[in-house]
Amino acid sequence: MAMAQKLSHLLPSLRQVIQEPQLSLQPEPVFTVDRAEVPPLFWKPYIYAGYRPLHQTWRFYFRTLFQQHNEAVNVWTHLLAALVLLLRLALFVETVDFWGDPHALPLFIIVLASFTYLSFSALAHLLQAKSEFWHYSFFFLDYVGVAVYQFGSALAHFYYAIEPAWHAQVQAVFLPMAAFLAWLSCIGSCYNKYIQKPGLLGRTCQEVPSVLAYALDISPVVHRIFVSSDPTTDDPALLYHKCQVVFFLLAAAFFSTFMPERWFPGSCHVFGQGHQLFHIFLVLCTLAQLEAVALDYEARRPIYEPLHTHWPHNFSGLFLLTVGSSILTAFLLSQLVQRKLDQKTK
């Protein structure tokens, strides 16, 4: 009888032990919400669902890497491309003497710059939903990556792809102007994000410096395409250069027009957004560009070695200056954002 009483007291306590962990478990967080449940800062044109809730843990946002939401494709397009670039760099290391060949440094810089913009972009699209401050800050970081890539592209084109005639015209100003325009592009993009004005002023701040930077950066390639119009010329890199131009123009078109989601409002929450197509064509542009630059590095040494015997400017210093000034710009704008948000909460 005493044993039965002890067991009757023990069984409820065992049931409590089993049930308590179940009661203590928090409900699984909701991974996506409608547009009305997030601030207007996070809204995308014509996208009404698939947003991630704010103010979750960092672990939550990293877990969304494997969930469906309206930024998932943007994350994976650039994340996978960054991994492909690491594999491409491993192949370069087997065939290119980066330490012993001084002419290989621009090739390394363009690979590094490409990996930087792709990884920064993937990080921004993955984590920007944490809060308003982090939304601004991560996209400022994204614009730093774009500026770094702009200068890396300019350097690679100027070093390997340029024809002697165009080199003679622009050698004194090309790289300093490329560094300045890359930084100006970073400033314009960050400022446009900061002021949050979708009209003419915002687009001018972001797009005009970027257009000027691209026009300068791609000029050695365009000049070479026009002067190498002979179809019998054995220049396999030229096809890749043409492809990178076409892919970039397609990317720019989708970036600027919000197509096709403007044709199907409310139907492109996960797939089919213009920004996703912008990412895809930009990745194709970068991969074609790297193949062209690699071919030029191997085949055009008799052309570019004499051109770069004496440097009017230190391109490594200009690269570091572009990186440093862009990071400083993003940091200062993030501080302004913090002040603006603090004033809003008072």
UniProtKB/Swiss-Prot annotation:
Residues 94-103, 159-169, 259-276, 338-346 are extracellular. Residues 1-72, 125-137, 191-237, 298-316 are cytoplasmic. It is found in: Cell membrane. Expressed in a wide range of tissues including ovary, testis, placenta, uterus and bladder. Keywords: Cell membrane, Developmental protein, Differentiation, Lipid-binding, Membrane, Oogenesis, Receptor, Steroid-binding, Transmembrane, Transmembrane helix. Disulfide bonds: none annotated. Non-classical progesterone receptors involved in extranuclear signaling are classified in 2 groups: the class II progestin and adipoQ receptor (PAQR) family (also called mPRs) (PAQR5, PAQR6, PAQR7, PAQR8 and PAQR9) and the b5-like heme/steroid-binding protein family (also called MAPRs) (PGRMC1, PGRMC2, NENF and CYB5D2). Belongs to the ADIPOR family. This is Membrane progestin receptor alpha. It comes from Homo sapiens. The gene is PAQR7.
